[in-house]
UniProtKB/Swiss-Prot annotation:
The keyword Metal-binding does not apply. One of its GO terms (molecular function) is DNA binding. Pfam families: Putative_G5P. InterPro entries: Putative_G5P. This is DNA-Binding protein G5P. Belongs to the inovirus G5P protein family. One of its GO terms (biological process) is DNA replication. Keywords: DNA replication, DNA-binding. Homodimer. Binds to DNA in a highly cooperative manner without pronounced sequence specificity. During synthesis of the single-stranded (progeny) viral DNA, prevents the conversion into the double-stranded replicative form. G5P is displaced by the capsid protein G8P during phage assembly on the inner bacterial membrane. It comes from Enterobacteria phage I2-2.
Length: 108
């Protein structure tokens, strides 16, 4: 069982970016659907850092098998402040894996 924060959204895939020290950083993309205020929906993309240890354990293969599927992603949240900038970063949690969930279809 997971205690903490879960992001629920559609898995978009993973990519690799370079950190400031030029080492690779793996990132998971999660699409979050939300109402657009006009009767439709739009999608925000949350970027979740993947720790090197999880990359080495094969989590990127799991992510690739879940592309396009609705999932719950366990994350750790960290606020930061550096060089006059502030932000929040999300990191994939070691506590539990990414879980595919059933899509609910609402009929009006």
């Amino acid at each position: 069982m997971h205690s903490g924060i879960l992001i629920r959204g559609r898995i978009l895939g993973s990519r690799t970016a370079n950190r400031d020290n030029n080492s690779p950083q793996h990132i998971l993309g999660v699409g979050i659907q939300k109402a657009d205020g006009f009767g439709g929906t739009t999608q925000d993309v949350e970027q979740v850092k993947i720790p090197d240890q999880l990359v080495q354990s094969g989590v990127v293969n799991q992510i690739n098998s879940l592309i396009g599927k609705l999932c719950e992603v366990p994350i750790n949240v960290r606020s930061w402040s550096m060089n006059g900038k502030n932000g929040t970063s999300y990191t994939l949690s070691f506590e539990s894996g990414i879980q595919e969930i059933e899509e609910l279809i609402y009929v009006r």
